[in-house]
């Protein structure tokens, strides 16, 4: 999370909106913490080679996923199903296993073999038979989602200009 005061400070230091936007959307997150990459696959490879910065970025990301999922679970009064999607959720079996292990108190039980078999191309149930909550890996066509969002923004801009 980011203290809003940081944004005010950067603007006071002469940063323009484009530079702040680049910092927030291009230079933060996994890249900002690791100094290496925003790609989890790259970071996993670096961490396997002993890179402490990559390990720190992965650990922080995993912690935040667990924290936010736990908070949402509390707000919702429980879970019926958890879905892992998007590039990392679809493709990172280690992350899915770590998240489910830390949220075992909710009744989540992941099947390690099924988790490894999820291919990111098909919806795949990865919960163990004794799990009280279903766990799914759901593929996302991120390119299509981005194109839809861009088209919506263009329609919005055209409507305003008309």
Where are these regions (language model features)?
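Conserved ATP-utilizing enzyme core subdomain
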Residues: 1-45
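Generic, low-specificity signal for short hydrophobic/alpha-helical stretches with a mild N-terminal bias
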Residues: 2, 6, 25, 47, ...
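Generic alpha-helical secondary structure signal
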Residues: 5, 18-19, 38-41, 52, ...
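Conserved short-loop catalytic and cofactor-binding motifs
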Residues: 8, 53, 87
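Adenine-nucleotide phosphate-binding core of ATP-dependent small-molecule kinases
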Residues: 22, 29-33, 40-75
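Internal helix-turn-beta structural module
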Residues: 55-75, 79, 83, 89-160
């Amino acid at each position: 999370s980011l203290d809003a005061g940081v944004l005010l400070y950067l603007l006071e230091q002469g940063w323009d909106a484009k530079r702040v936007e680049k910092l927030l959307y291009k230079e933060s997150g996994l890249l900002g913490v690791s100094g290496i990459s925003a790609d989890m696959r790259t970071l996993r490879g670096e961490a396997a080679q002993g890179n402490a910065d990559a390990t720190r970025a992965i650990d922080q990301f995993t912690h935040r996923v667990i924290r936010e999922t736990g908070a949402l679970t509390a707000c919702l009064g429980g879970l019926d199903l958890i879905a892992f999607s998007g590039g990392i959720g679809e493709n990172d079996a280690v992350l899915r296993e770590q998240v489910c292990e830390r949220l075992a108190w909710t009744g989540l039980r992941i099947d390690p073999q099924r988790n490894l078999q999820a291919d990111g191309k098909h919806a795949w149930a990865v919960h163990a038979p004794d799990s009280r909550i279903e766990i799914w890996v759901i593929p996302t066509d991120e390119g299509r989602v981005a194109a839809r969002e861009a088209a919506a923004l263009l329609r919005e801009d055209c409507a305003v200009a008309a």
